[in-house]
């Protein structure tokens, strides 16, 4: 009986690893496509400037970014999104859309996918592409 449970756990771990690999590959392909399309901001300052101008729809932070730097960047991102205003019907109205920040991939993987070196923070400029990246990750996780 105990051996059977160990075998089940091994199968589950292998399945989780395979799903993780598939999700990662699809995600990396999509951010590579975004880079080739010119729909990416590279690095912390470019991403923050893009957010302030309302041009960034998704911010990607590498999961192996040092914890202090990651926390600092998350705070800056949240602050930038909170201060984002759009002009609507002649009135300034605070943007209330979801903050799309994901922590995924390593710095090396993400940088390689977009053809740059040492880029732990990447911003996706195209709203539809950002939704596609998020949707594809969620679909893979849900098994759809």
Show which residues each predicted segment covers:
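Helix-rich interaction surfaces within compact, conserved domain-sized segments
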Residues: 102-144
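Mid-chain, well-packed structural core segment of small domains
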Residues: 80-116
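Signal for well-folded cores of large energy- and translation-related assemblies
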Residues: 32-35, 52, 78, 115-118, ...
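A short, gly/pro- and small-residue-rich
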Residues: 69-88, 140-141
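Gly/Ser/Thr-rich loops at beta-strand to alpha-helix junctions
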Residues: 64-67, 129
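Ribosome large-subunit tunnel/peptidyl-transferase-proximal elements
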Residues: 2-55, 68-74
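Short glycine-/polar-rich loops that comprise or flank the Walker A/P-loop
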Residues: 54-57, 97-99, 118-119
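Acidic beta-strand-to-loop metal/phosphate-binding motif
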Residues: 57-63
């Amino acid at each position: 009986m105990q051996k059977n449970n160990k075998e089940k756990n091994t199968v589950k771990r292998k399945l989780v690893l395979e799903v993780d690999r598939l999700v990662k590959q699809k995600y990396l392909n999509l951010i590579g496509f975004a880079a080739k399309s010119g729909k990416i901001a590279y690095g912390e300052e470019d991403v923050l400037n893009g957010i302030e101008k309302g041009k960034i729809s998704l911010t990607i932070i590498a999961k192996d970014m040092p914890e202090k730097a990651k926390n600092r960047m998350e705070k800056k991102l949240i602050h930038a999104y909170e201060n984002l205003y759009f002009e609507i019907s002649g009135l300034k109205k605070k943007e209330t859309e979801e903050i799309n920040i994901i922590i995924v991939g390593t710095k090396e993987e993400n940088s390689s996918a977009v053809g740059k070196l040492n880029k732990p923070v990447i911003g996706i400029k195209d709203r539809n592409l950002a939704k596609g990246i998020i949707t594809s990750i969620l679909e893979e996780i849900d098994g759809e």
